[in-house]
């Protein structure tokens, strides 16, 4: 049976999946939702993050140590940088990659380039502080407050490294959130793919879907685990 490896986005930790995880476990799946180095309960180690490989090495070690196979690898938001690079590292271990409102640069592009390449790169040791979330749309005040208490800074170094291509043999599912604002890296990814005529899934929810729409996210992930090539039999595709 497949196993899920869930990778959170910027400023968050493994806790970001806690509302999705029970649905996957109830369906009989093993689920791993680690906090990246320097995030969540590991935020005090942010200074050890030297680049994208710091995160990829960390997750690859988990996959190999636990001998995970047939992995449904899920990256949300900035987590898309990590899952894309991990897929290039360990394609033989994967069932598929699910890009959930994820920042996915073109091969060889950097995460920071999705924001428009800066004239001068920020210092690699910079840790960007989080901005408090504001309730609105599908993010209620209680959830926003709970998340704000757990947000942490995000090392910028991984966003300064080029991201490799996902090998062609690894199936990919792209799902975007309708409520994601213009300018978000994941929105840039969505708009690029739409302009190229790609057929992706659009979820009617905000960017923090794992917290605000866990039932919907779980349904997407379970459908991907069953048959990533047939995702559009369950979720209506959108295209440019």
Language model regions located:
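Gly/Ala-rich beta-loop-alpha elbow adjacent to hydrolase catalytic centers
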Residues: 74-79, 83
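Active-site nucleophile elbow and catalytic-triad environment of alpha/beta-hydrolase enzymes
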Residues: 148-166
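Short, proline-enriched alpha-helix->beta-strand connector loops that line the catalytic pocket
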Residues: 166-172, 196-198
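Conserved HGGG/HGGXW glycine-rich cap/lid loop of the alpha/beta-hydrolase fold
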Residues: 2-43
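Conserved loop-alpha-helix segment in the C-terminal half of the alpha/beta-hydrolase fold
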Residues: 178-211, 223-225
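Flexible "cap/lid" loop of the alpha/beta hydrolase fold
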Residues: 88-94, 98-130, 183-192, 235
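Short beta-strand/loop motif that positions the catalytic acidic residue
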Residues: 174-176
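Active-site loop/oxyanion-hole signature of alpha/beta-hydrolase fold enzymes
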Residues: 30-71, 88, 114-117
């Amino acid at each position: 049976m497949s196993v899920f490896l869930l990778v959170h986005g910027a400023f968050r930790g493994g806790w970001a999946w806690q509302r999705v995880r029970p649905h996957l476990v109830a369906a009989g799946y093993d689920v791993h939702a680690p906090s990246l180095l320097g995030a969540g309960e590991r935020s005090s180690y942010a200074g050890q993050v030297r680049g994208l490989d710091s995160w990829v090495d960390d997750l690859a070690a988990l996959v190999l140590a636990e001998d995970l196979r047939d992995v449904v690898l899920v990256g949300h938001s900035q987590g898309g940088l990590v899952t894309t690079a991990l897929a290039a590292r360990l394609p033989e271990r994967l069932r598929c990659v699910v890009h959930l409102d994820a920042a996915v640069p073109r091969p060889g592009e950097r995460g920071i380039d999705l924001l428009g390449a800066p004239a001068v790169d920020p210092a690699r040791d910079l840790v960007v502080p989080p901005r408090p979330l504001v309730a609105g749309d599908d993010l209620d005040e209680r959830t926003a407050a709970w998340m704000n208490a757990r947000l942490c800074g995000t090392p910028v170094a991984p966003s300064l490294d080029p991201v490799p291509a996902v090998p062609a043999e690894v199936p990919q599912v792209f799902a975007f959130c309708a409520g994601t604002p213009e300018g978000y890296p994941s929105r840039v990814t969505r708009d690029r793919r739409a302009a190229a005529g790609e057929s992706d899934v659009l979820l009617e929810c905000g960017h923090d879907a794992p917290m605000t729409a866990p039932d919907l996210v779980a349904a997407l992930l379970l459908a991907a685990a069953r048959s990533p090539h047939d995702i559009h039999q369950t979720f209506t595709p959108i295209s440019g």
